[in-house]
Amino acid sequence: MSELLRARSQSSERGNDQESSQPVGSVIVQEPTEEKRQEEEPPTDNQGIAPSGEIENQAVPAFQGPDMEAFQQELALLKIEDEPGDGPDVREGIMPTFDLTKVLEAGDAQP
């Protein structure tokens, strides 16, 4: 089917109003045999799931060494940043206040 569509789209790209002079063969779609269907189906047993419904960690490697220490430090920083309040990049001081009447008057003035 895709060959038929490809041949027609190529002939229209060339600007020819005539059908392509190349013969287009029929496309045969083959259904997979019963053996192949069985091979393609995923296993139906629930591997890694305990009867209680919890997922078992069978092949999860444990963190060890300097990577674990770096991971813990990064995790601690993330926890600090996620807490409500000011972050480390907030400067202490008084924020400037704007008098809206002065701002509006300045906007009305024409140069």
Curated annotation (Swiss-Prot):
Bridged cysteine pairs (disulfide): none
Region: Disordered, residue numbers: 1-66
Pfam families given in the database record: GAGE (PF05831)
Source organism, top-level taxon: Eukaryota
Biased composition (Polar residues): 8-24
InterPro entries found in the cross-reference section: GAGE, GAGE_fam
Family stated for the protein in its record: Belongs to the GAGE family.
Protein name: P antigen family member 2
Organism listed in the record: Homo sapiens
